Amino acid sequence: MDSSNAIFKSFLGKAPEWYKICIIAFLVINPLIYFFISPFVAGWALVAEFIFTLSMALKCYPLQPGGLLAIEAVFIGMTSAHHVKEEIMANFEVILLLMFMVAGIYFMKQLLLYVFTKLLIVIHSKKILSLAFCLSATFLSAFLDALTVIAVIISVGTGFYGVYHKVASGNSFEDSTDISNDEKIITNKEILEQFRAFLRSPLMHAAVGSALGGVMTMVGEPQNLIIAGQAEWGFVEFLLRVLPVSLPVLICGVITCLLLEHFKIFGYGARLPRRVWGVLARYNLLKEQRMTQQDRVKMGIQALAGIWLVVGLALHLADVGIIGLTIIIICTAFCGITDEHAIGRSFQEPMPFTALIVVFFTVVAVIVDLKLFEPIISYVLSADPHSQLALFYVFNGLLSMISDNVFVGTVYINEAKTALESAIISREQFDLIAVAINTGTNLPSVATPNGQAAFLFLLTSPFAPLIRLSYGKMLYMALPYTIVLSIIGFLSLEFLLPPLTELMSNWGWIITR
């Protein structure tokens, strides 16, 4: 084997050869487009290529191919290293969240698995169980960040999967085995596939639930805080102003959840195999029998840490990542986990995604520097006031499907604020536009993992390949929700928001500044 073949073989590891050739082609083509055709076209090509690497996440983790494309983009001048740093610092809360909050949830796994196992054993109806996951995620994400909620759900799902996988492999509950290795599973493969299909349903219901709750409050999503700051709204005012859109969407989202499970369409409706239920019930009984006073104390400490987590985030007592760090310290200190390697294991899952998010911010920097969204923004602001709400909602939604919704929301609200200060739009129109931006970035963005950081985190987590949740599968399962949420959001914005906002203003519930 000559050196060139050896380099090609080691390049991107076990990824398919056609995929390696695609990435090499992108790296060759991008500078040519940038220098000889148009920087604008090159920028959109980079965005499309990055989305492609995300869609192939099960073939190759997107960090390496996406990272190479991002490095080249900086090297040829599509953006600068300084601007990348500025984007990272502007989104540093997200970095801290991924580093510490996800690791903090790891140390609450014992309590979470105990509670959700009880839930799974007690609730026999798949519809009620799906609804419970959807509404739990909705409620939690109204006060917590959606990434935190998804981290909890992933932790629980991995726990369930691991319990059955060990038994199906012929091991006991206590054995330490590689749950990604199916070689020892011979007779139970069909049941394992059914279990995977079952796990995908509540996971996707919860993921969409996090978006339903995230749109409602100013702490639900990072861009909500930015929008609330520009509009000078408090917690209650934000909730009230968004309610004419968020409440109908929530009701229709819940109905969609029930209909999907009832008609067993779009990959939903798979039931928990009886044998798996038996394994989980035995596991729960065994844990109950073997639970010592020390175990109960540990779960009590984790419960108190969970209460602090909800209160701290709901009242915004500190940044999300800092609260996550306090969870790590409290849980490890009082549960007796002081070994450096034991603590280090909690960081194994979030760190690759944290690195991927930094690469994503590089692509965002390219979007800003090459003004890829500027033609759309100019078109929306030049429209007549009656059409502006619909246009802001639609274009926010479309751009949020392919780009970070925090970035899209920030760009649009800043442009709207500039238009207000320039007297291009009135204050009343600005308030309505702010709601359109908030709902536009949060609702249609469930269509793809690109728009919602929580969805991207789920797709690139180690749990996704275990249950065969690919990019395409996520698109397919999210499709009915995308259609319902987007249409109901649009209709509510057009026909309910202006009259109900005026009504609340007349009642004195909200004020026009």
UniProtKB/Swiss-Prot annotation:
Chief location: membrane
Signal peptide extent: none
GO molecular function: sodium:proton antiporter activity
GO CC terms, sorted: plasma membrane
Keywords: Antiport, Cell inner membrane, Cell membrane, Ion transport, Membrane, Sodium, Sodium transport, Transmembrane, Transmembrane helix, Transport
InterPro entries, per the entry: Na+/H+_antiporter_NhaB
Catalytically driven reaction(s): 2 Na(+)(in) + 3 H(+)(out) = 2 Na(+)(out) + 3 H(+)(in)
Membrane topology: Multi-pass membrane protein
Entry's transmembrane regions: 21-41, 88-108, 119-139, 243-263, 299-318, 322-344, 350-370, 389-409, 477-497
Location of this chain's protein in the cell: Cell inner membrane
Family in the record: Belongs to the NhaB Na(+)/H(+) (TC 2.A.34) antiporter family.
Function in brief: Na(+)/H(+) antiporter that extrudes sodium in exchange for external protons.
Protein's name in the database: Na(+)/H(+) antiporter NhaB
Taxonomic source organism: Actinobacillus pleuropneumoniae serotype 5b (strain L20)
